[in-house]
Amino acid sequence: MPGCMMKTIKEAVVVGGGPVGSTTAFHLSQLGVATTVFEEHDEIGVPSHCAGHLSIRSLRSLGLYPLPNGIVENVFSAANFHSPASTTFSIRLKRPVTCTVNRELFDKLLAERARAAGAEYRLGSRVSSLLMDNGFVKGVNAEHDSGVESVASRVTVDAEGISSRLLREAGLPRLNGARLVHAVEAEVENVANVQMDAVEVFIGKDYAPGFYAWVIPRRDGSAKVGLAAKSGNPKEFLQRLMFKHPVASRMLGNSRIVKIAFHSVTLGGPIPRTYANGFLAVGDVASQVKPTTGGGIIFGLTCARVAAETAAAAIRAGDVSAFFLGQYQRRCREALGFDFSVMLRARRFLDSLSDEKIDKAFRICNRLGLGKALEDVEEIDFQGRLLLQMLTKPASATALAYFLLLYLSANP
């Protein structure tokens, strides 16, 4: 029977070998911090739980674009939004603004970058609990084939994704279960009638109640298809989208699912506190996810660098108290707080609209020529800043005023 192994000591431990965990480990290692990453799966990037639809501008600002050959699956300069009654509102931009990446290869790239900087990886090692001492997180207990290993660390960074296990032990707020949606993502072959440079978005309670569905074509003729919903069975909604939706069925009616995955997405904005004595939470586990689209990679990578810089400074100062580590949350709020505030309001607005009001909003957008007004948009992640940019355009300002009236009428 596997036994308990002796305690080993590290300066920093990162829980989770996804993009956020690997980026945290990369920056920690670059700053001279001896770092070990614990990943419960035997292989980085497997299984994949995300479409990998990312902003080119944001990737470039993070030093990750252009990406090596084979990782980018497609680039996009257009989007078609389909209302519940199949009114289509289209945006065609002047240049490609987003790309999709092969998540397995993307995750492996970030892990190899961290390894090259000096980080150690323990694959097939599941962190089961924290080592606690007098209110301080002092490391982790990790389970693997040969037993349970206790690893002491000055700072532990939780980047394990959607989970509240370690948050509870560290005394931090849990993820808000009321703000979760449940997603299904599939890779499909034999797709037809798609624009290769356009993402398709489908809205309506019959197909994705409380969120939306998407079709993202790949250059090889396949596509990534998915949706999320607040209630109901995501797999049943996916079948309905593929074979019953008047627009999507023309794209997917003869397609075949070759891979499928299920996961949850948090839309409630960052948890109230992301730090404790000897402990930081970053990425999905801290709900650093866009409330509008559910995308978490770019904001997670942004916060990962801040987490690493804060942890390294704390270790150098010999002070890993919550008071010192609290600067991590303050810096993240300075960088992203305005955008989160705008997106949370936008999410409440979207949730308040009936299908009928969404259809009317689409017609108004087309009538005002909003698609033309947005053709030079490049910023899609930092949506508070996008809002300020939109307000300089007459058509956008008029549409936003209309949406505000819709919101007020839905929230007396």
What are these regions (language model features)?
Residues 113-253, 287:
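Predominantly flavin-linked oxidoreductase catalytic cores and closely associated redox partners
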Residues 55-109:
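A conserved beta-strand/loop capping segment in the N-terminal third of enzymes
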